[in-house]
Amino acid sequence: MMPINQLISLLQPENVQVDSFNFKLHSKVTVAILLLSSLLACHGQFFSEPIQCTDIPGVSKQVVDSYCWTHQIYLVTSKTAGHDGRDYAYPGVTAERSDVNDKRFLSYYPWVSLVLFLQALCFVLPNYLWKTILGDNISSLMQHNLKSSGSESVQRNIELDRLAKEWSNSRGAYGHLAVAYLACEALNLVNVVGQMFLIDRFLGHTFWTFGSDIIENSMMPAEVRVDVLSEVFPKMSKCSYWKYGPSGQIDQLDTLCNLPINFLNEKVYIVLWFWLVCLASMTTLYLAYLLTVILVPSLQIKIISSKLPRPANKDNVSFAVHSKKLNGVERLGDWLVLNMLFSNLDKWTNGQIVERMNQVLA
């Protein structure tokens, strides 16, 4: 598993930008949200009272709380529809014994903090794979003294010539980076959708419509409104405790349990639902944009030209970026690397680099 210090380092600002804004939404923003949520859930679980159950005669309250926390609590499904104080005391809670088929057991709550942390690792993985495959290809092309847009110097001209020659010698060598980049961006979409499936399974197949149900319920009149959150994150539940009676028989004793931890859990997953839906949508749009860039080579030239001083000579840009001797994947790789390089430099420097490239390639 990835060390914690590497995970934290991926959240810090980078000196050389080698990924897209979409990548940062996954590997930085989403990871930060998940780690913060995991810490909050961990605090609620280990540094407060996550569960509080009513007393059972002859049994320590601490034992009852621990038992119900580590074993499955449940709701009575036939008592989840209706209104508090009229149809039931609390949603999913009844005084009568219930058939096992009428019970919905809840077992997710002790694992929330761990699952959120593992999800954070999953969102780091595509970016980690991309940077591992990329290596130092961009940093080796970019020298620190090229960032300055000051006056001309002998050293600067030497570095510009070196970069232009290195580029001419390595044209067509970055095709595998284009394939890897597209694969990792696609993996971002697969991961976010997969995580939504995972959460849905983890919460008992209630996550997919979680946010939409909340929005729909909030628009209903108050007299017919139902507490949607109580069905997924109940604040009150039942727990069956088994013990030996005076004559050696096994007695089933039911207790009512309060779950303060679910006040936090419901807020965490509300935020996650809206964020993951937005993230999946933005990632889909970004992949559609990448597909358009791949299918329209002239768009690649426009993107590079936008990072040069105006007016940019598109013929010079096309000559530096696209070689007729290379196939489509190799040209895409050259464009990708040059686009990342220019994203780290100012327009004045980028313009000089294109001029030197044309001189060397001519």
Question: Can you describe what each PLM-predicted range is?
Answer:
Residues 1-362:
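Membrane-embedded alpha-helical segments and the immediately adjacent membrane-proximal loops
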